[in-house]
UniProtKB/Swiss-Prot annotation:
InterPro entries in the cross-refs: SMAGP
UniProt KW keywords: Cell membrane, Cytoplasmic vesicle, Glycoprotein, Membrane, Sialic acid, Transmembrane, Transmembrane helix
The encoding gene: Smagp
Designated name of the protein: Small cell adhesion glycoprotein
Organism: Mus musculus (Mouse)
Lineage start: Eukaryota, Metazoa, Chordata, Craniata, Vertebrata
Main location class: membrane
Function: May play a role in epithelial cell-cell contacts. May play a role in tumor invasiveness and metastasis formation.
């Protein structure tokens, strides 16, 4: 009867890495990993803050920079110039059929 395998102990049953208990870290290693996580979060936050700040200043600086080429209302020379340009354009029209 010695040839029959004995029932494995619970520790032997947990042979896959998924079921094995995780190794406990030393306090120094745990502090180091916590510090690393804090540094990564801080760098990401500062990067996002700087990008938002740059976008804000860019939008503030370029506010109202849209330029139109239309004459201001009330300028008679500009209105006269527009009328003469349209008259010249009518003289040079060609129609192809």
């Amino acid at each position: 009867m010695n040839n029959l395998p004995a029932t494995p102990s619970p520790e032997e049953l947990m042979t896959t890495p998924v079921f094995q208990a995780p190794e406990t870290l030393s306090p120094q290693a745990e502090e180091a990993s916590t510090a690393l996580i804090a540094v990564v979060i801080t760098v990401v936050f500062l990067t996002l803050l700087s990008v938002v700040t740059l976008i804000f200043f860019h939008l503030y600086k370029n506010k109202g920079s849209y330029v139109t080429y239309e004459p201001a209302e009330g300028e008679p020379s500009a209105i006269l110039q527009m009328e003469t340009d349209s008259a010249k354009g009518r003289e040079k029209e060609e129609y192809f059929i």
